[in-house]
Amino acid sequence: MQTRNAFSCIKEGITRSISISVMIYIIIRAPFSNAYPIFAQQGYENPREATGRIVCANCHLANKPVDIEVPQAVLPDTVFEAVVRIPYDMQVKQVLANGKKGTLNVGAVLILPEGFELAPPDRISPEIKEKIGNLSFQNYRPTKKNILVVGPVPGQKYKEITFPILSPDPASKRDIHFLKYPIYVGGNRGRGQIYLDGSKSNNNVYNATAAGIVKKIIRKEKGGYEITIVDTLDEHEVIDIIPPGPELLVSEGESIKLDQPLTSNPNVGGFGQGDAEIVLQDPLRVQGLLFFLASIILAQIFLVLKKKQFEKVQLFEMNF
């Protein structure tokens, strides 16, 4: 009986250890696997700077296009689509964190006007749900429901991302008005070149930190290189570490300059930002416009009928 209890305790202890290890792994890995929105959320209170620049560009250095499509106007308390397109060459492969090549992921940030927010699931139509797929959107901050982020997600499946947006109702929110509002978007494809702490990722160019002669190049067992540079002036040695991923451009015995690229640029992705405008339309104004158009059409009809009646009278008088 004691043997069984001891065995049960050991089994329970092993299970707990495995669970704790898995949890620690997930916590440690989360910032890297969810690099696009998480890094920005951790470092910036607002993703759009006063200059208009979206902060994702601080880590994704290459400039790439992005496109957004929204309706010209929407009525209050209605759900509409904001479609973000992130184009790139589907054939290219990016350098992964382990130095191997893999497919590109994409991510996006959508900055809506105050009052606009992600539509609740029960308000989203089946057609829009089909376009959304398995995407999961989140608020940039719990207090900033008008700023949405998504990603990283597979680029081959989500080059086009559909955000379901709920427009505000000025009748229930006094700080909302029937006006034209700007919408800002940022979209990236591929990994970034700079981490939040300013250090380089392996998806970047590595330059020489000293001028001199390349004395020795050691290829590491897990990938990457250790390059020893001898300064020609005072003979002191400088060691540059290259992570796995970038291709080496220099060889032993070669003379190099300060800041000369030691590797190729492996980055095939990039970040882009754009904007659009949307009008929160007053239903009474729409009704007034329809009434005005209807009155014009009726006036035209009466004018035509009156003209025909006048022509008949003239024809009748001519016969007499």
Curated annotation (Swiss-Prot):
Needed co-factor(s): heme
GO cellular component: chloroplast thylakoid membrane
Bilayer topology term: Single-pass membrane protein
Record note on cofactor: Binds 1 heme group covalently.
InterPro entries: Cyt-f_TM, Cyt_f, Cyt_f_lg_dom, Cyt_f_lg_dom_sf, Rudment_hybrid_motif
GO molecular function: electron transfer activity; heme binding; iron ion binding
Subunit organization: The 4 large subunits of the cytochrome b6-f complex are cytochrome b6, subunit IV (17 kDa polypeptide, petD), cytochrome f and the Rieske protein, while the 4 small subunits are PetG, PetL, PetM and PetN. The complex functions as a dimer.
The protein, known as: Cytochrome f
Species of origin: Phaseolus vulgaris (Kidney bean)
